[in-house]
From Swiss-Prot:
Record GO terms (molecular function): 2-C-methyl-D-erythritol 4-phosphate cytidylyltransferase activity; D-ribitol-5-phosphate cytidylyltransferase activity
The protein's name: Ribitol-5-phosphate cytidylyltransferase 2
Stated family: Belongs to the IspD/TarI cytidylyltransferase family. TarI subfamily.
Keyword Calcium: no
UniProt superkingdom: Bacteria
Pathway(s) of this molecule: Cell wall biogenesis; poly(ribitol phosphate) teichoic acid biosynthesis
NCBIfam families, per the entry: PRK00155.1-3, PRK13385.1
Any single GO BP term: isoprenoid biosynthetic process
Enzyme Commission identifier(s): 2.7.7.40
Annotated site residue numbers, Positions ribitol 5-phosphate for the nucleophilic attack: 160, 217
Length: 238
């Protein structure tokens, strides 16, 4: 089976003094989360589309789904965890408890606050994850990346054409991700906050799918302005 895991567990502290977590803020008069969910509903390959949100915001999430006529029976809401990977594991726990987990099951995990992903990106994630077990969505780095260990001096400058900026979705064979996560120590779980990094550290290759420059993560007030400009300028592909 193929699952979507929409990661809406953040509280949006970088957004500043706002009344709601960032995933519930509006762009073009509609919550960011709804824009994102609508992209996933269009993909018939998904058996279930699971939203993980803070426990105290589950009722609000269900209310906005009703308000914006998200009636697709594949859409479920579960409680997120204390961090990103725990949120993904909560989704996997839900899958295991409801359907069980088969060897070829795939999960496409995606930031709820990246509302501009395309059908191509989603479908390529599914295809590559089914074939290879793990995939990250990336774009080539445009700017030169510098590394500093003390935040004052440059210590190295990586070769730019080897650098990529990670986006989401990140997609996995569920058993591969679950087993790799369970093999981590508590200390490793604190450090390895990215699911793809967990797979890389396990020794399993992670394939790349081409993202889009406009597949932005809306985390700051500036991002919110950019997101509205993307919609109003009809920049993003369908």
């Amino acid at each position: 089976m193929i699952y979507a895991g929409i990661l809406a567990g953040g509280i949006g502290s970088r957004m500043g003094n706002v009344p709601l977590p960032k995933q519930f803020l509006d762009i073009d008069n509609k919550p960011i989360l709804i824009h994102t969910i609508e992209k996933f509903i269009l993909v018939s390959e998904f058996n279930e589309i699971i939203i993980a949100t803070p426990a105290q915001w589950i009722s609000h999430t269900q209310d906005i789904l009703k308000k914006y006529n998200i009636t697709d029976q594949r859409v479920k809401v579960v409680a997120g965890g204390t961090d990103r990977n725990e949120t993904i594991m909560n989704i996997i726990d839900y899958i295991r408890n409801v359907n069980g987990i088969n060897n070829d099951d795939v999960i496409v995990t995606h930031d709820a606050v990246r509302p501009f992903l395309t059908q191509r990106i989603i479908k390529e994630n599914i295809e590559v994850a089914e074939k290879y077990g793990a995939v990250d969505t990336v774009i080539e780095a445009i700017d030169t990346i510098v590394m500093s260990k003390d935040k004052q001096n440059i210590h190295s400058i990586p070769v730019r054409n080897e650098m990529y900026q990670g986006q989401t979705p990140q997609s996995f064979n569920i058993k591969l991700l679950q087993d790799s996560y369970r093999a981590l120590s508590s200390a490793q779980k604190e450090i390895l906050s990215d699911a793809c990094k967990i797979i890389v550290e396990s020794g399993h290759p992670v394939k790349l799918v081409r993202g889009e420059l406009y597949n932005i993560k809306v985390t700051t007030p500036y991002d919110l302005k950019v997101a509205n400009a993307i919609i109003q300028g009809d920049i993003a592909d369908d």
